[in-house]
Amino acid sequence: MAKKQQTRSYTEAIQNRKARYEYQILETIVAGIELLGSEVKSVRLGKASLNESFATIHHDEVWLENMQITPYEFNHLDALEPKRSRKLLLHKEEIRRLQSKINEKGLTLIPLKAFFDKNGRLKVELALAKGKKLYDKRETIKGRENERHLQQLRKQY
């Protein structure tokens, strides 16, 4: 009898909703993240936040700063700091390419979302982004309102 294949879908754990509003996304890249077991359990329960988090590059390593992971309530062995720096896993060539773009153009690395892949590993989608000015944010809001208005008109007919 054939063995049933177990298929896991990509489950989106957490998302940084403000990132697309406050930044102009130029390029995205997916990276692995180095976590401890209790942190993975917390993320699976949805007790994590990417708000106000960003990535930095130090000594050819990428670090995710200010990612909030609430400590797992059943872990009594070690108390971890909720906003500690976490290492992101990328190839050296990718890190050097990102470093050069950040240095020459004044761009920022921000996380857009974190999700579990088909193997159950947590991945972080990073974006190479440029901060929006206030008038750019207003244009985004106007465009969204116009789109909503058009949708309402289409529903009426």
From Swiss-Prot:
Q: Name one Pfam family in it.
A: SmpB
GO CC term, one of those recorded: cytosol
Intracellular or extracellular location(s): Cytoplasm
Transmembrane regions: none
Q: Establish whether keyword RNA-binding is in the entry.
A: yes
Q: Which Gene3D superfamilies match?
A: 2.40.280.10
**What biological-process terms (Gene Ontology) are attached?**
trans-translation
- Per the record, the major location class is cytoplasm
Q: What does this protein do?
A: Required for rescue of stalled ribosomes mediated by trans-translation. Binds to transfer-messenger RNA (tmRNA), required for stable association of tmRNA with ribosomes. tmRNA and SmpB together mimic tRNA shape, replacing the anticodon stem-loop with SmpB. tmRNA is encoded by the ssrA gene; the 2 termini fold to resemble tRNA(Ala) and it encodes a 'tag peptide', a short internal open reading frame. During trans-translation Ala-aminoacylated tmRNA acts like a tRNA, entering the A-site of stalled ribosomes, displacing the stalled mRNA.
- Which HAMAP family does the protein's record reference? SmpB
Q: Which family is this protein grouped under?
A: Belongs to the SmpB family.
Q: What is this protein called?
A: SsrA-binding protein
The organism of origin for this protein = Chlorobium luteolum (strain DSM 273 / BCRC 81028 / 2530)
